[in-house]
């Protein structure tokens, strides 16, 4: 009886520790459902129905592995990816990495910020510029939570992630997708046209986020409690749960667009405003409102995550620190410029996601090299199978990017 009580107590303690260590992956996962995902998934679903769902499935599986590796690097070494690159690579390479990572972070933030502004515009009936001002204010307020530590921020962002997931359960109920065709689209690969390749690259860029690869390793580098193996085990659960939720949201986005737009003849729906306006008569005003609210929630939470990632990148690569409010102010400027110039915000969102796909390999190559180094990682070093899978992902990403560049250059 005593042994049972001891085992029961130790089991509860292990579960309590696992719960305490969960959270970083939810911050990382919010980057996988930002407004860039809304734009690319809606465009892909409206244009090609369920044919590109398989891209979301495979991109999400790749993302799970990548985020586990990133988190593992922080746990095993106590340093994040940017710091490891700084410590192991020549200075010119480090500066190159910092510049491209900042560009990627700004491209990401552009999509997130404009997406939230569009969301405010749709649900409140304000102008895009007024929506941007509201987004800026809301972002500053959310970032103030960081002063209280990482946990309050994890809870708020995790709550927003769950809200977006719940919103898309509602959207699926409204749109009633064809489950047989949906399942087929998830399993059978198809790239019918050059536009499909462009959108597939966009989906990949929107699903696997380079800035979150840098960020996740910093969120786990200061995790304490239990052994390294216990922290790693808890982190794998954290990533599996958070990324499964994010993957479901991405699939639901594309499936809803396919069911609501593609199969009703609205294959040209390509921007968020049009999607909102088209949803009202096709499904209902409630469905359109839920769409707008989920866009605001995704945009606000992901732009906060983008700001944190930018801070990690700067501190890690060049040991330079600026206050978060200064970084937030500077990174808002491109969004306001795009809005004031009257550029098509949804096109900017999709282009930013394609740009992101070029940063994936640059972040992933050193991550694979470091996590495969037994001197750095000790007992958490990558297995042979993980190494091989990681390099296959790099080759696939690079091949898709080359295909995209050649196709764009030749006007295919």
Swiss-Prot record:
HAMAP family: NRAMP (MF_00221). Residues 1-19, 72-95, 146-155, 221-238, 298-327, 371-387 are cytoplasmic. Residues 40-51, 119-125, 176-196, 259-276, 345-350, 407-412 are periplasmic. GO terms for cellular component: plasma membrane. H(+)-stimulated, divalent metal cation uptake system. It comes from the Bacteria. It is a multi-pass membrane protein. GO terms for molecular function: cadmium ion transmembrane transporter activity; manganese ion transmembrane transporter activity; metal ion binding; symporter activity. The chain crosses the membrane at residues 20-39, 52-71, 96-118, 126-145, 156-175, 197-220, 239-258, 277-297, 328-344, 351-370, 388-406. It is found in: Cell inner membrane. This is Divalent metal cation transporter MntH. Belongs to the NRAMP family. GO terms for biological process: iron ion transmembrane transport. The lineage of its organism: Bacteria, Pseudomonadati, Pseudomonadota, Gammaproteobacteria, Enterobacterales. Keywords: Cell inner membrane, Cell membrane, Ion transport, Membrane, Symport, Transmembrane, Transmembrane helix, Transport. It comes from Shigella dysenteriae serotype 1 (strain Sd197).
């Amino acid at each position: 009886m005593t042994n049972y009580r001891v085992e029961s107590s130790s089991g509860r303690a292990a579960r309590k520790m696992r719960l305490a260590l969960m959270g970083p992956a939810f911050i990382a996962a919010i980057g996988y459902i930002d407004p860039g995902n809304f734009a690319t998934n809606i465009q892909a679903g409206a244009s090609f129905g369920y044919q590109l769902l398989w891209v979301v499935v495979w991109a999400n599986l790749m993302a799970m592995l990548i985020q586990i590796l990133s988190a593992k690097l922080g746990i095993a070494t106590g340093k994040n990816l940017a710091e490891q690159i700084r410590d192991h690579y020549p200075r010119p390479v480090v500066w190159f990495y910092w510049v491209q990572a900042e560009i990627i972070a700004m491209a990401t933030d552009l999509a997130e910020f404009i997406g939230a502004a569009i969301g405010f515009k749709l649900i409140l009936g304000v102008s895009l510029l007024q929506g941007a001002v509201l987004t800026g204010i809301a972002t500053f307020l959310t970032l103030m939570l960081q002063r209280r530590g990482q946990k309050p921020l994890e809870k708020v962002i995790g709550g927003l992630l769950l809200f977006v997931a719940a919103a898309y359960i509602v959207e699926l109920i409204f749109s009633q997708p064809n489950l047989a065709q949906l399942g087929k689209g998830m399993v059978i690969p198809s790239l019918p046209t050059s536009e499909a390749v462009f959108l597939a690259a966009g989906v990949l860029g929107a699903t696997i986020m380079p800035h979150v690869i840098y960020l996740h390793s910093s969120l786990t580098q200061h995790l304490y409690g239990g052994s390294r193996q216990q922290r790693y085990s808890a982190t794998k659960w954290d990533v599996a749960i958070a990324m499964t939720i994010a993957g479901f949201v991405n699939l639901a986005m594309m499936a809803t667009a396919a069911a609501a737009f593609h199969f009703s003849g609205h294959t040209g729906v390509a921007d968020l405003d049009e999607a909102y306006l088209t949803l009202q008569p096709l499904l209902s005003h409630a469905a359109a409102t839920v769409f707008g609210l989920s866009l605001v929630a995704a945009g606000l939470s992901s732009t906060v995550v983008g700001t944190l990632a930018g801070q990690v990148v700067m501190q890690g690569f060049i040991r330079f620190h600026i206050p978060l409010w200064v970084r937030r102010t500077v990174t808002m400027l491109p969004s306001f410029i795009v809005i004031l110039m009257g550029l098509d915000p949804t096109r900017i969102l999709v282009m930013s996601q394609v740009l992101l796909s070029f940063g994936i390999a640059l972040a992933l190559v050193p991550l694979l090299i470091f996590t495969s180094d037994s001197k750095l990682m000790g007992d958490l070093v990558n297995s042979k199978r993980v190494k091989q899978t990681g390099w296959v992902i790099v080759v696939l990403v690079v091949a898709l990017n080359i295909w995209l560049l050649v196709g764009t250059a030749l006007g295919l």
